[in-house]
Amino acid sequence: MNYKTPTKAIITDAGFASRYLPITKTIPKAMLPLGNRPIMQLVVEECVDAGIEEIIIVATPEGRKIYDDYFHDECEKIEALLTKQGKVERFEPVKKVLNFPKITVIEQDQSLPYGNGSPVASAREFINDDEAFIVAYSDDVVFGASAVKDLIEAHKAHPDAMAIIAAQEMPHEEMNKYGAISLKDESAMTLKDIIEKSDDAPSDLASYGRYLLTPEVFKYLDPKNIGKDGELWTVDAITRIAETGNVYVEKTKGTWMTTGDPKNYFLSHLKYVKEFEDYYKDIKKFVAEN
């Protein structure tokens, strides 16, 4: 079966981000800022730039309220105050957020086991049986190009795909930090397996949190299929699909960085400032002088 090209994306932020405590006791990790935009907004914008029409954000019960407020509250009092002060142009970034395509925020199904596959499974009712869809982990940001757009273009080239996963080449000596891709057919770029954090990586291609999936994945995102550490893993489901169907690997054009821990969050923030803010030169000067 050939599935329809994606128009929907599931973005996940349903964990508790214990490496960021105490701040994530109150604020979802993907609401931490890069410049004046939260990480989640950058992931949403990547999807919007690729033509995605509907986004489902999967959050914790506490995070759901915060994401609903951020993407849906019209903040009329703030706009009125800025208008009165003659600073209404400062409200333009808020209007941009409010004008995004349809965004629905849901809670992760609490009956599912822990693991990054459970937020995806929680959004099953939003996905039609005949359509492919995007899954994006909000831990990951992509600079310079939309990985979501790359995946959608790859789907047009491979309508037989049961899934397509994003990949980035990394230095070989660092591959023990990532999920290393093993290819079934190098010329066709089809997946055999993903080997997590191994000192004997089968390639220098690292898998990261951008996937084009089909409803086939829900057959395997089931509590009876828990894997390492008793968790439900999206990667496990994808490799099960690869056993009988074509899962393609797409080397994306942008630069992927993770925000999954404080160190890499800081590096991602620095990359953001370098790319988007004119005060980067002041930061370079400060670092040089101190």
For each of these PLM feature ranges, what is it?
Residues E173-K177, I181, R210, T214-P215:
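Nucleotide-activated chemistry modules centered on ATP-dependent adenylation/adenylyltransferase
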Residues M1-I11, R19, R37-E131, F143:
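Conserved N-terminal catalytic core of the sugar/cofactor nucleotidyltransferase
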Residues V141-E174:
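Conserved donor-nucleotide/metal-binding helix-loop-beta segment in metal-dependent transferases, i.e.
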Residues I106-Q110, S122, A166, K197, ...:
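Conserved beta-strand termini and adjacent loop/short-helix elements that scaffold enzyme active sites
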Residues F16, D140, P262:
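Active-site metal-binding loops of divalent metal-dependent hydrolases
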Residues T26-Q41:
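Short catalytic helix/loop segments, enriched in acidic residues and glycine
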Residues I134, V148, I152, K156, ...:
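Catalytic-core segments of class I nucleotidyltransferases/pyrophosphorylases
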Residues A136-S138:
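Active-site acidic Asp-centered loop
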